[in-house]
């Protein structure tokens, strides 16, 4: 069967016939990586074969250096908003699959979506990822657009609102992506789950998602439809992680060659237990913690300007470790079932590893010296897609990122945080303010911070 731009034979031959790199080669690659321009995908494939624990530590140190140089100590926060768990697919690893009788099914009404949004806004969230199963057929896009409009319409005094809605829904035709673009979505996100054709077909026995090529080319159609920011992802544990990473790099290369820019984000979930799924309970290719850290670090080194996302599938310890390796966005206070923020419900897509509230996550992040960020400035000023990368790669985007992180964090501290989080958060802001790169921007940031204390909101560069 045609596998599109994923060259299975090349990947399988490489994995079968290639030895791990020597110390000298690893260090040469890492030295190149420290130039902050990424490394060739052939070089990344060499690091992928690395198993020596001592050399892996050097890879981790390099990834940490790159993360700090490009992103500083910022972590973007968001929450998923699940609006429907109806699904026509029968993905073996997912609790939403149509044959699963062990969960209750629900599609939120527009009023219920607004209520869920009000709860998220009242916690302090500014960014959400709208998620839906593939169960609404021809009406899915109409429903999604109404859901997006509902989220944006919610205002909770004194300054509560969602400022960026990203969306994760099934693969669509070009015309539908054009409609989503008009609805003011941020990033369109869709996971390939596995790039390995045999595994993909085994894991997706029926439903629209069973079409490997249609699913694989979704990002092409999204970008043809005018969506500048797209997010890709792999569900690690379904097949050999080395194959998956090499295929992901081929996908990125394809997008760069065709559209001039790769994905805006890469999501890195590991398969976790899901109600009614034996596969989820016993992954066929379980990825160890060390292997997972290698994946994160390798991708940060290879595509240094691409956002990398870790969800609450992972426990607090792994999430902490991942920050220094390259993760730049994390979800917080998540629920993975429709209506989950307003009531507990047995309809979740998968089990969570991190059950903490948003404030508890923020307190933890701030105590580590990171700045929690709710920034949406680039999206609203049109710094997206290729324009974003044109600013990011020369290092110019940093002029905006830290000040915007500080102002959005200040909004959270003033209006939503506990006293304990506010105390540590103010210290982080005071410290990080000194790292704003130029005096003029620093002065303007201080002005914005004071305006927020005085009642201002949504101040960004």
Task: Label each region the model flagged.
Residues 98-115, 119-223, 228-232, 236-238, ...:
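Core AdoMet radical
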Residues 1-32, 320-325, 334-461:
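Radical SAM enzyme core and accessory elements
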Residues 10-20, 26-58, 66:
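Acidic, glycine/proline-rich low-complexity segments that act as flexible tails and inter-domain linkers
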Residues 141-152, 181-187, 241-259, 289, ...:
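Short, electropositive alpha-helical surface patch
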Residues 132, 187, 213-277, 285-317, ...:
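Conserved C-terminal portion of the radical SAM core fold
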Residues 79, 117, 145-152, 177, ...:
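Generic structural signal for well-ordered alpha-helices
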């Amino acid at each position: 069967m045609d596998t599109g731009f994923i060259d299975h034979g090349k990947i399988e031959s490489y994995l079968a016939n290639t030895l791990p790199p020597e110390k000298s080669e690893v260090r040469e690659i890492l030295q190149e990586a420290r130039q902050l321009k990424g490394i060739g995908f052939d070089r990344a494939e060499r690091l992928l074969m690395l198993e020596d624990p001592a050399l892996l530590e050097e890879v981790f140190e390099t990834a940490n250096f790159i993360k700090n140089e490009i992103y500083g100590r910022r972590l973007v926060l968001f929450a998923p908003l699940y609006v429907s768990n109806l699904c026509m697919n029968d993905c073996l690893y997912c609790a939403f699959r149509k044959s699963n009788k062990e969960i209750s099914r629900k599609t939120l009404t527009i009023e219920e979506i607004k209520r869920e949004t009000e709860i998220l806004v009242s916690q302090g969230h500014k960014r959400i990822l709208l998620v839906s199963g593939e169960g609404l057929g021809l009406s899915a896009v109409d429903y999604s657009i109404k859901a997006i409009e509902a989220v944006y319409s919610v205002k909770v005094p004194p300054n509560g609102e969602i400022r960026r809605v990203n969306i994760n829904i099934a693969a669509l035709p070009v015309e539908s992506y054009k409609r989503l673009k008009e609805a003011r979505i941020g990033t369109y996100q869709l996971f390939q789950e596995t790039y390995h054709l045999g595994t993909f077909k085994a894991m997706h026995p029926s439903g629209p998602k069973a079409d490997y090529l249609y699913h694989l080319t979704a990002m092409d159609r999204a970008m043809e439809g005018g969506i500048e920011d797209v997010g890709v992802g792999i569900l690690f544990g379904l097949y050999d992680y080395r194959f998956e990473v090499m295929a992901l790099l081929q996908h990125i290369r394809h997008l760069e060659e065709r559209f001039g820019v790769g994905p805006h984000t890469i999501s890195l979930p590991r398969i976790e237990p899901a109600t009614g799924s034996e596969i989820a309970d016993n992954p066929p290719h379980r990825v160890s913690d060390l292997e997972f850290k290698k994946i994160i670090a390798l991708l940060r080194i290879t595509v240094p300007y691409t956002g990398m996302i870790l969800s609450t599938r992972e426990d607090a310890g792994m999430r902490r470790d991942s920050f220094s390796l390259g993760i730049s966005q994390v979800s917080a206070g998540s629920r993975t079932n429709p209506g989950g923020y307003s009531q507990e419900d047995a309809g979740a897509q998968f089990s969570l590893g991190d059950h903490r509230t948003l404030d508890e996550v923020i307190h933890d992040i701030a105590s580590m010296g990171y700045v929690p960020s709710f920034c949406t400035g680039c999206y609203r000023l049109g710094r997206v897609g290729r324009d974003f990368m044109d600013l990011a790669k020369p290092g110019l985007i940093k002029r905006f990122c830290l000040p915007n992180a500080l102002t959005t964090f200040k909004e959270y501290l003033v209006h939503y945080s506990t006293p304990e989080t506010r105390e540590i958060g103010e210290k982080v802001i005071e410290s990080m303010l000194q790292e704003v790169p130029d005096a003029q921007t620093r002065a303007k940031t201080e002005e914005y911070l004071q305006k927020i204390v005085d009642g201002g909101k949504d101040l960004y560069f």
